[in-house]
């Protein structure tokens, strides 16, 4: 999966980008991850057992840019995702941009769908780093790290909602943290 994530990153039309790969030292793919390191791809190794919120905080701490974006290794960010979101967040004068909907692929049911508008896929976030809150990194909430971040921005009315579902494909598979199949209330149309 990480090969596709790195390929999507390298294919982004936005020129000034950096990818932070965070993994624990027990990762069986550690040697493979090291092969991706270059001028704009950094690898950070952490102790085994860190929850995803902690891993994401580490990636934010290691990022050099003025803006940060979530980059999941199992999803596909199409080539203009960063450029379109960056342009929109600047034009909107907001602190964060989420896509209002996305393409969703259920790899178990072998179905591709267009999510309903307003679903807001959390992993499509692009945010101004200076005002970014910390991810939830408590072990008792290992898979809901994105929710408090999104609620923080919604409460502040600082969200730029971009309706361009063709920029992102959310993959559903048996290792997802939140759902293992498309939920009926998630979709508008099955493609």
Kindly give the residue locations of the regions a language model identified:
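A conserved acidic beta->alpha catalytic loop
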Residues: 23-32, 72
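Short, acidic, metal-binding catalytic loop of nucleotide-sugar glycosyltransferases
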Residues: 7-16
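Short aromatic/hydrophobic "clamp" motif used to bind/position activated sugar donors
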Residues: 68
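Conserved donor NDP-sugar-binding/catalytic core segment of glycosyltransferases
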Residues: 82-111
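Short beta-strand/loop segment that forms part of the nucleotide-sugar
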Residues: 16-26, 42-46
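Glycine-rich, basic loop-to-helix element that forms the pyrophosphate-binding segment
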Residues: 46-63
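Acidic donor-binding loop at a coil-to-helix junction in glycosyltransferase catalytic cores
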Residues: 142-149
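Catalytic beta-strand/loop signature of glycosyltransferases that borders the donor
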Residues: 100, 160-167
């Amino acid at each position: 999966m990480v090969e596709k994530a790195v390929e999507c990153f390298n294919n982004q039309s936005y020129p000034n980008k950096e990818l932070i790969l965070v993994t624990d030292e027990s990762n069986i793919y550690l040697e493979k991850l090291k092969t991706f390191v270059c001028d704009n791809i950094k690898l950070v190794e952490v102790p085994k057992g860190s929850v995803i919120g902690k891993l994401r905080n580490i990636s934010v701490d290691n990022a050099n840019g003025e803006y940060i974006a979530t980059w999941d290794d199992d999803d596909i960010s199409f080539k203009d995702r960063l450029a379109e979101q960056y342009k929109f967040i600047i034009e909107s004068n907001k602190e964060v941009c989420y896509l209002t909907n996305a393409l969703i692929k259920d790899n178990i049911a072998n179905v591709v769908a267009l999510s309903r508008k307003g679903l807001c896929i959390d992993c499509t976030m692009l945010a101004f780093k200076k005002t970014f809150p910390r991810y939830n990194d408590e072990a008792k909430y290992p898979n809901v790290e994105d929710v408090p971040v999104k609620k923080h921005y919604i409460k502040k009315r600082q969200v730029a909602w971009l309706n361009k579902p063709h920029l992102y494909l959310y993959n559903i598979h048996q290792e997802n943290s939140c759902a293992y199949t498309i939920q009926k209330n998630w979709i508008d149309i099955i493609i």
